[in-house]
Design a protein with these regions (language model features):
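Patatin-like phospholipase
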Residues: 3-139
Length: 139
């Protein structure tokens, strides 16, 4: 089996998901990611991920400059507590950004972005609400 996502994997590696497969084998060998196109287009679009610094309990907003070099931030932003090991980058232990700032609209407004796109990953009928400029708004 190419992809392992299991309790066995969690015990063996400390991660429920096979991170070597997800962040190295898949984008570098099996379904090669077009890093050159990403790097050419980054001058037109900023790409950020949100991670949580587990020692400070604060969000980390990482701007990706080179997808291959910065893949650790993508991994950290998807590393869920209890089923993933910390991802250590730049002297910090990082996990999923949802732990500290699940919908970082205000953070990006502080960075100067006036419009933000938020993609819901669940049925809109779940009652999920997002605080936008002091008002609760369903997105």
């Amino acid at each position: 089996m190419l992809f392992r996502s299991s309790t066995e994997n969690l015990i063996r590696t400390g991660n429920f998901v096979d991170t070597d497969f997800c962040y190295h084998e898949l984008p570098e060998i099996l379904d090669v990611y077009d890093y050159d196109t990403f790097n050419k287009n980054k001058e037109h679009t900023d790409f950020y991920v949100v991670c949580s610094d587990v020692e400070k309990g604060k969000p980390v907003y990482a701007k990706l400059h080179d997808m291959k070099r910065d893949i650790g931030y993508i991994q950290a932003s998807a590393s869920l507590p209890y089923v993933s090991k910390f991802v250590e980058l730049d002297g910090r232990k990082l996990l999923d950004g949802g732990c500290t700032d699940s919908v970082p609209v205000e953070a990006f407004r502080r960075l100067g972005y006036k419009r933000n796109v938020v993609v819901l990953t669940r049925d809109s009928g779940t009652g999920c609400r997002v605080l936008v400029s002091g008002r609760g708004r369903a997105l």
